[in-house]
Amino acid sequence: MEFEELKSIVEKFFQDQTIVRMNLMLNKEIIVSYNQFEEIIKDGDLTYRYAEKNRTVDFYEYRNNIHSIINYFWKDNKVCIIEIDFWRSR
C-alpha cells in the first residue's frame, strides 16, 4: 500500500460517520516521510506515546470522539507504519 491510498482510507473514515472502527494491520510497512506522517495525524492531539527499542506506539484523540493508535518505527529518517487503528467512542 502506498501513502496516497492510506491517506484516502483515513479520510474516508473521518468523512463517513457510519464507520465505527477501522484497523489496518499490514504485512509490509508503509514507508512515509515525516511530513506525510503529519498529514495522517493532522488535527489529532497526542495523548500518550509508548516507545520500546525501535518501535513506537502513539495514541491520539480527535474531535467528534475519534481516537487512534499508530504503531510504527523509524528507518533511514522515514516513518514505517506497521498498524493503524481508528475508532469512534460512543
UniProtKB/Swiss-Prot annotation:
InterPro entries per the UniProt record, alphabetical: SIFV_Orf14
Gene3D superfamilies attached to this UniProt entry: 3.30.160.300
Name this polypeptide is given: Uncharacterized protein 90B
Organism of origin: Sulfolobus islandicus rod-shaped virus 1 (SIRV-1)
Upper lineage: Viruses, Adnaviria, Zilligvirae, Taleaviricota, Tokiviricetes
